[in-house]
């Protein structure tokens, strides 16, 4: 029972820290372009301005 006196504030502190980190990520734009990374994987990189060399 005495351990709950320590564990409950620790759990609430970690939850609050996670919430602050999530809100910071939202504010800094980490979730703005969710589809961009999946499309960049499929891009072969043969766009303008890039030199394509064959070996």
UniProtKB/Swiss-Prot annotation:
GO terms for cellular component: plasma membrane. Pfam families: FixS. GO terms for biological process: nitrogen fixation. The chain crosses the membrane at residues 4-24. Its main location: membrane. The keyword Amino-acid biosynthesis does not apply. Keywords: Cell membrane, Membrane, Nitrogen fixation, Plasmid, Transmembrane, Transmembrane helix. Coiled coil: none annotated. The keyword Transcription regulation does not apply. It is found in: Cell membrane. InterPro entries: Cyt_oxidase_maturation_cbb3 (IPR004714). The four proteins FixG, FixH, FixI, and FixS may participate in a membrane-bound complex coupling the FixI cation pump with a redox process catalyzed by FixG. PANTHER family: FIXS PROTEIN. NCBIfam families: ccoS. This is Nitrogen fixation protein FixS. It comes from Rhizobium meliloti (strain 1021).
């Amino acid at each position: 029972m005495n351990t709950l006196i320590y564990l409950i504030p620790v759990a609430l502190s970690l939850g609050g820290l996670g919430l602050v980190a999530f809100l910071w990520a939202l504010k800094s734009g980490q979730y703005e372009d969710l589809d961009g990374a999946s499309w960049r994987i499929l891009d072969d990189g043969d766009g303008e301005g890039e030199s394509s060399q064959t070996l």
